[in-house]
Amino acid sequence: MDMKRRDFLKMTAALAAAGVSPSLLTAGKEQFTVYGAPAMPSVTIAVTALQGKLAKQADVSLKIWRSPDQLRAGVASGQFKVMMSPSNVGVNLRNQGQKVGMVNILTNGITQLVCKGSAIASPQDLVGKKILVPFKNDMPDIVLQALLKKLKIDAHKVSITYAATPPEAVGLFPSKGYHAVILPEPMATASLLKGKTIGINVVHGFDLVKAWGQAF
């Protein structure tokens, strides 16, 4: 989906506002909280909460979880009743005995490789590079590790540094000696825009979805 910078900033601002507001609608209805991921699909949830049929029946609020660990804890405690989740987390929670079910796959292909200077054109070109990745042992780290293994690329030859969250990765990427960062939207676009504002050439690398499809 093509998006102008102004539209992106509006959507990001709306998502941020939804994450901190106690409610997206007026009070007086049944409280209904959806816990969204720190990624572009939560914008869809925010719009749906405002304009969808559910909004007529419940006081819908959207809160954003910061990490998969927070998501797991929220489900285990019973606090999270309706939430967005990486597909692997949902499956693992179910296998662990949690009473959760997946309604649908909301989106795919939103995880991007963003590079500093020149684009990294293929997975093989990651060798010798310093890569910044959020959420160790979760998406997108699982995707990267599986891709390297499938293509028989020695993971020890790729220098991987982990950030706690995508926003933290966006902040670290320009000022450190990283060649690339793996980010979900809208954080990938935020990284590109930040590069422009501070005079650093930040570009898209190879298509992770295409590389995955070719490998598997």
Region locations from a protein language model:
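Pocket-lining segment of extracytoplasmic ligand-binding domains
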Residues: 88-89, 168-216
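N-terminal export signals
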Residues: 7-26
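A structural signal for short loop-to-beta-strand junctions that line the ligand-binding cleft
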Residues: 32-36, 98-105, 129-132, 199-203
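Alpha-to-beta junction loops
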Residues: 76-85, 98-99, 129-130, 174-183, ...
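Short, well-ordered beta-strand elements
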Residues: 29-41, 58-63, 128-132, 161
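Short, polar/charged alpha-helical segment
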Residues: 38-65, 69-70, 74-76, 92-96, ...
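Short helix-initiation/N-cap motifs at beta->coil->alpha
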Residues: 63-73, 86, 158-172, 186
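Flexible hinge/capping segments at coil-to-helix
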Residues: 116-131
